[in-house]
Regions:
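N-terminal anchoring/stem segment of glycosyltransferases
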Residues: 1-78, 125-127, 146, 204, ...
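Short beta-strand/turn micro-motifs composed of small residues
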Residues: 7-10, 109, 186
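GT-A fold catalytic core of metal-dependent nucleotide-sugar glycosyltransferases
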Residues: 57-115, 120-130
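A short acidic, often aromatic-flanked loop/helix-cap motif at beta-alpha or helix-coil junctions
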Residues: 39-49, 115-116, 169-175, 192-193
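Conserved strand-to-helix beginnings and helix N-cap segments that scaffold or border functional pockets
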Residues: 18-19, 93-94, 148, 196
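A generic structural motif
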Residues: 32-41, 109-110, 145-149, 164-169
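Alpha-helical elements of Rossmann-like donor-binding domains used by nucleotide-donor carbohydrate transfer enzymes
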Residues: 20, 64-67, 96, 135, ...
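Catalytic core and acceptor-binding pocket of nucleotide-sugar-dependent glycosyltransferases
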Residues: 130-244
């Protein structure tokens, strides 16, 4: 069987994560297919609506996803991985993923708390999967919104089979139990603001791998926010201790 295409989007501001994924992905059963997006496109499309998720109203991800599903069908490729770039990748991804393909699921999502997270997707190249994502796109055209929120809404009408990954083996940084050995971690942020978001993701990544070789790819204007984020964590911890005493 030919390697499974593993697509992820990245832009210059996220080169830090792009280089990490390139160096970390060791499974020969996958073929990495990085999709570089001009930084100007992200600058134009993201953080458009104050007070909303920074992906609100952006079609970048869903349009690329649909394009790659069409391409997979044309090439008789049974499955694709379509993911974000801000990941911690450890050995054993394919063996952990294979069971979902053996069970012939149409779609497999990350589970983040009570909802589906679309940052790491295993997708069967099929018409019903394409129809599902087209439904989400149509919903976004009709009323501007967040693709992930619409994915959770549209799943209720999906006629195929779907499930979620084991939520500790394929985990999110805000739902990991801090003890299970994971193979994928989606590094999330608290949405404190554009610069803080990146700083928080870098800080969280540094808890799991040596990031020093990759700090050369971090923009200089982000560095002060990393230190500030650590200060906020320490402040929050002290406040929590004080509240517990009182």
């Amino acid at each position: 069987m030919s390697p499974i295409p593993w697509y992820y989007m990245w832009s210059e501001n996220y080169r830090f994560f792009h280089e990490i994924v390139k160096d970390s992905m060791k499974d020969s059963e996958f073929a990495l297919r990085p999709l570089e997006i001009p930084q100007s496109r992200f600058d134009r499309d993201l953080y458009k609506v104050e007070g909303k998720h920074h992906w609100e109203g952006s079609f970048i991800k869903i349009d690329l996803l649909l394009d790659k599903l069409d391409e997979a069908i044309e090439n008789s490729q049974p499955y694709i991985l379509f993911t974000d770039v801000d990941l911690v990748v450890k050995p054993g991804v394919y063996s952990a993923l294979k069971t979902y393909m053996d069970d012939e699921y149409d779609m497999v999502f990350l589970k983040e708390g009570s909802h589906l997270n679309i940052g790491f997707l295993l997708l069967k190249a099929s018409n019903n999967v394409i129809d599902y994502w087209k439904t989400i796109r149509n919903m976004m055209v009709e009323k501007e919104g967040h693709d992930q929120a619409y994915a959770n809404e549209a799943i209720k009408g999906f006629t195929g089979t779907y499930t979620t990954f084991d939520n500790q083996l394929f985990t999110c940084s805000n739902t990991w139990d801090c003890k299970t050995e994971f193979v994928i971690m989606q590094v999330l942020c608290s949405c404190l603001g554009k610069e803080f978001n990146m700083a928080e993701k870098i800080f969280n990544t540094a808890q799991h791998i040596d990031v020093q070789p990759y700090m050369q790819y971090v923009k200089e204007d982000i560095i002060p926010y990393i230190y500030r984020f650590q200060e906020l964590l320490a402040q929050s911890y002290q406040e929590m201790k004080t509240d517990a005493v009182n």
